[in-house]
Amino acid sequence: MKTVLITGGTRGIGKAVAQEFLQQGYEVILNYFHDEEAALATQSEFNMQGYCPVLMRADVSDEEQVKDMFKEVFRIYGKVDVLVNNAGISKIQVIQDTSVYDWEEVFDVNVKGVFLCSREVAESMIFSGGGCIINVASIWGEVGASCEVAYSASKGAVIAFTKALAKELAPSFVRVNCVSPGVIDTEMNSHLSEVEMEDLINQIPLGRLGTGEDVAKACLFFAENSYVTGEVLSVGGGFSK
């Protein structure tokens, strides 16, 4: 049975990705950090469906915590077949109000976290003859978003990281790809007013918000297709502004 570790896997997009992989018969490890109550509730919800995902608490921006998490995962499962780097944070603010702390906090989770988790899993994947790393970026990393400079820049970095690492690991049959969600109906977009949300929907050719399931199916495609690497798949309903 294949194993997938999903960072930020107990809510939003990560939870939807977990659901998709559980339904496909994967052993699923759900990483979380801040909200243990929500993590346990998600685990319980999956248990009621007959699934048994494992929770792993770790701050993906903390090198030692990431190392400890993967040591425990390797102890239990031996390897990780698929890593989904989904954990991320955003800050809504104009650049004049963005402190160095704000900037570094976003980059620590969104970029450093992807680096640390990918680094820890790479050697195992190489020695086991292959694997798959899927990074969750954002359409804002491709086109930019006003008042989200730090977030947009961090997701642009994730896209560049994906393309570079894909070339580096391809000779070892480790595939690295990126899913780039558009406007998805999750808690991360709850700050948007009804008018702002309507304006965004009007810019989406398919005329609706995306769902976590839409993103999850893209992740599963990358996990299951052995001849795709270095790609960025936009899941945004045609939004490209």
Where is each model-derived feature located?
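Alpha-helical segment proximal to the catalytic Tyr-Lys
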Residues: 123, 167-171
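C-terminal substrate-recognition "lid" of short-chain dehydrogenase/reductases
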Residues: 130, 208-235, 240
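Conserved glycine-rich cofactor-binding loop
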Residues: 10-11
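Substrate-binding pocket helix/loop in short-chain dehydrogenase/reductase
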Residues: 94-95, 102-107, 200
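Active-site helix of classical SDR
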Residues: 118, 154, 162
